[in-house]
């Protein structure tokens, strides 16, 4: 995992690297959790299911080869700024991608993830996702309850009024990072 301030250079799938690093501690202050595992990832996921009380999981592959003509629209959809009312938990099984999360001062922090990385985004944090120029990621999604993926756009003014958003903002009020 590598995190840094995002600097828009046109193609969302490129690094867009400002060279301003963001530490794991800074991500923790934003309630973003990260772990890496080098062993068998399905066995690791079994342990996570028990450790965190996850009840469901599935796997998704986002690739130009697999999605064909639907690929560009799918990646565009994932890159729209949004939040969820539940945690977003992803274990990267293969390939790589970028999760962008909003900092306390509303800048984009880009997080590069690759095989073996586990990232947990808290409910209520604005974020987006894109593949890299490799155009391939295989991830496991873990859920506390039934699998669901409901994205609430930042352009929808009601997203700021959601309990998940309010709770998230209260949880980071005392945090000072990036």
Swiss-Prot record:
* Cofactor(s) recorded in Swiss-Prot or TrEMBL: Fe(2+); Ni(2+)
**Reaction equation(s) it catalyzes:** 1,2-dihydroxy-5-(methylsulfanyl)pent-1-en-3-one + O2 = 4-methylsulfanyl-2-oxobutanoate + formate + 2 H(+); 1,2-dihydroxy-5-(methylsulfanyl)pent-1-en-3-one + O2 = 3-(methylsulfanyl)propanoate + CO + formate + 2 H(+)
Which SUPFAM superfamilies does its entry note? RmlC-like cupins
Q: Phosphoprotein among the record's keywords?
A: yes
Which keywords has UniProt assigned to this entry? Amino-acid biosynthesis, Cytoplasm, Dioxygenase, Iron, Metal-binding, Methionine biosynthesis, Nickel, Nucleus, Oxidoreductase, Phosphoprotein
Which Gene3D superfamilies does this one have?
Answer: Jelly Rolls
Q: Which InterPro entries match?
A: ARD (IPR004313), ARD_euk (IPR027496), RmlC-like_jellyroll (IPR014710), RmlC_Cupin_sf (IPR011051)
Q: What is this protein called?
A: Acireductone dioxygenase
Species the sequence originates in: Schizosaccharomyces pombe (strain 972 / ATCC 24843) (Fission yeast)
Question: Which lineage ranks, top first, belong to the organism behind this chain?
Answer: Eukaryota, Fungi, Dikarya, Ascomycota, Taphrinomycotina
